[in-house]
């Protein structure tokens, strides 16, 4: 295909010297050649800054930004401020992509007059030998408007990742990544989709997502685990002017509150537990009267609102089993 459109690919780099070469090589070797590759060194303390500079010397399409450490969102925002492309893509620096990913995404986007094009991704464990069928004769779906936002909030948070997508640049004119949170992709996609965009989605697997043991998503329960509640709370509040979308946002927000409430009961984190219980109680009437909420969710909301001691007991028995039963018998 002709390649007049410039695609800017933003790659935040931090403590990934083991993986960086494989990542950048997969971008440099794309079949679509009209690329601007922006490596954002986010104050990495290892050999990554020098590796980025070496890559820039090898390929004139590569630009390097060196900055103080500010986190993933800060690095992506620095790339957005510097990029000049007609389209924008994101690749995490420990991941890699299929050789034709960006040519494929641009092609299906143009054919379907879409603002965003999306492919599937596969989660890879370190040292795995998974072979992926990345054929292009895959199922395509076109989504837009309310339907797109509802799909985003109803899926798990991986629905909202940025790295398996190609965006028209103008979508970021008023959107930046929120700093200081770990679920920044979902929130940024929400504000992009709120611009009434059209998205074409393909079932072709073009992106390889490395699941590292020390990655943010690979770590155990922590304070940052609650970021998903902040993100879905903000999305819910922002959608209050659209009853159809708000109902789905509320359902997802309460569902996550219950998931983390259960975890807090098991870990005996009373402060957070009370906050989440209060959120469930606050919206209990809306959930119990909602036509889109299933009986299981309504039952849990009822227990938390009206019979919380029983709910705590049920959670503890499920999590700690015989130890809880012994205490009751005593």
Language-model segment annotations:
Residues 197, 205-212, 218-245, 256-288:
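Catalytic core of nucleotide-sugar-dependent glycosyltransferases
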């Amino acid at each position: 295909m002709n390649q007049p459109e410039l695609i800017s690919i933003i790659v935040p780099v931090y403590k990934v010297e083991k993986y960086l070469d494989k990542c950048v090589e997969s971008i440099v070797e794309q079949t679509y050649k009209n690329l601007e590759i922006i490596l954002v060194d986010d104050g990495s303390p290892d050999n990554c800054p020098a590796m980025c500079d070496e890559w820039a010397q090898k390929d004139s399409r590569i630009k390097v930004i060196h900055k103080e450490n500010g986190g993933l969102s800060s690095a992506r925002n620095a790339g957005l401020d510097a990029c000049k492309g007609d389209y924008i893509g994101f690749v995490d620096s420990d991941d890699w992509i299929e050789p034709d990913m960006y040519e494929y995404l641009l092609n299906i986007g143009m054919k379907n007059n879409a603002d965003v094009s999306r492919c599937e991704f596969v989660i890879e464990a370190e040292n795995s030998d998974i072979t992926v069928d990345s054929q292009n004769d895959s199922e395509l779906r076109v989504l837009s408007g309310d339907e797109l936002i509802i799909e985003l909030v109803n899926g798990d948070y991986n629905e909202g990742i940025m790295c398996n997508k190609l965006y028209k640049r103008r979508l970021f004119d008023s959107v930046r990544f929120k700093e200081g949170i770990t679920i920044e992709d979902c929130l940024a996609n929400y504000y992009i989709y709120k611009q009434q965009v059209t998205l074409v989605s393909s079932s072709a697997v073009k992106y390889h997502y490395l699941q590292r043991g020390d990655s943010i998503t690979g770590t155990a329960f922590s304070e940052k685990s609650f970021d998903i509640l902040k993100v879905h709370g903000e999305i819910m509040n922002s959608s209050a002017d659209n009853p159809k979308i708000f109902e789905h946002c509320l359902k997802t927000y309460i569902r996550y509150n219950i998931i983390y409430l259960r975890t807090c009961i098991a870990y005996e984190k009373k402060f957070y537990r009370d906050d989440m219980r209060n959120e469930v109680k606050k919206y209990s009437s809306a959930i119990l009267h909602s036509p889109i909420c299933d009986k299981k969710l309504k039952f849990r909301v009822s227990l938390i609102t009206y019979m919380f001691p029983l709910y705590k007991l049920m959670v503890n028995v499920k999590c700690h089993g015989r130890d809880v039963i012994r205490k009751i018998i005593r």
